[in-house]
């Protein structure tokens, strides 16, 4: 019997190759991608790249997601394969094979499939490893080179991950055999799905959960809380999608059946009857396609937007080659650090900016009346932030004189309410808005709050000392900024950056013992070299992961579509043969098939685009935290991604639909 199960295992894989080809291809690609992610995460050469810590963090996170996604896709593909082999397994049981023999046969099939796919997957991963490493270097802006990235631990990690996945396959298939008798096995592949219960309640629940998920996505305004709300919204939308496909589609089909003028037409009757016959299974497949498609769209839109917007963020976050920023310190401290740096590094200055300003968060707003957080509320995250500059500083930055008098201010604001106001009240002090200003600090002074809040304002006052006195006792912070552009910013950039950090730390040690009556003094130094390296590492790594996660999700989408079309083709073939025998001609068969395929085609796509539309606001807030500050750029990226995905989706469905029509027409 041992030899018999060996021969059967091998012959079954050959006979069922049409079912196993997509399964094997998907598994090989999943293994290859997991191998590449593992190899890159362990690659010692990453330490030589700018932003190495950010790259490793993102790759490590991506490895976990890839491993989980691979497991889900392999399990899903296995369920389709086993469903279509139910009749075959039942026949073996009727012919005398016991369940332990069937289990032994399936175990050997899984071992053969696992060995072959692991061998090929690791081979493909190793083959493209160097090329992918060069691709990662190119994305993060480094010179490409085919550096060997093989790590000893890569193969054991991949083997452990997929050994767990294939072990789970064996357990799932074994449990399937244990709970079904031979008669059930022979009929399992042919039986229709049971009509669900409480369909109307499920439909209403689906609408409610999806609606609340959409509400969460649209109502969040704070980028930090958006990340938390995003996961809750995703879970609600996924649940709502499955409920609506499972129950909502059935309810709609039942309503169409009751509409006699529509239902009692040959094409409509056959299509609707086929969908109703197996709606539960059909609904799960369609919902899965919709969710996977949404994942592809959201991942690509987010990653591509972050990558496309990095130049804008760099210009905003690092307007100068070298900067020193101090909070609650005298301007002489920041000047001293920068002067010592320029003296010791020998850099020649092209442009130098020295600015002192205040910033504070708004606790309450009633039209144009604003209240600042009190001194003991500094740790509260504000919804709106003000940066305050003196009239002299404004002239220094722009070359223009506002000629403000007492109680007059100039204002640039992102606050929608304040844009229409002629005056503003801050902690009970009224000011007339003399002039509405443009963003006068862009490219000159970094605003650290642009990635945290979308509601920020720049206020220009005639006298800074008088203004500070009017808001005494509030959670206000004074910031001093010194930035320089040098003649040759690339010359010894790393060495210069380290020198600036060293001088800043030295000055901080001298300031540590000072008492100012406000939160302790702080000095930070930055170089465009460091900021750009960290940004390229994080953004490039994010795009890299986004691309490969999209491949994984698209792979899952293609698999579900393919197996769904194939399994439904075999199920529908016998019914179409019967219909042809009772008078349905070939043209009507093709028309009916086309109608059914188009219905199945559009539903997941409509849901996916709808999910993306409602998630767009939340995605924009999340990528804002990472530095995407241009909403128009994100919109263009989204349109391009949707267009490319639509074409890919149409191509996949066109190819799989041909298989469906060919099976049905046999």
Predicted segment positions?
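Hydrophobic alpha-helical segments
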Residues: 112-256
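Short helix-loop junctions at transmembrane helix boundaries
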Residues: 39-53, 122-155, 211-228, 603-666
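Short cytosolic juxtamembrane segments of multi-pass membrane proteins
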Residues: 3-7, 179-193, 570-574, 661-666
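Alpha-helical transmembrane segments and their immediate juxtamembrane interface regions
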Residues: 154, 231, 235-254, 311-337, ...
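Basic-flanked hydrophobic alpha-helices used for secretion and membrane insertion
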Residues: 313-314, 320-325, 331-555
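Hydrophobic alpha-helical transmembrane segments of multi-pass inner-membrane transport and secretion
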Residues: 18-45, 53-90, 110-124, 202-208, ...
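N-terminal Sec/SRP start-transfer signal
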Residues: 1-31, 195-200, 209, 244-293, ...
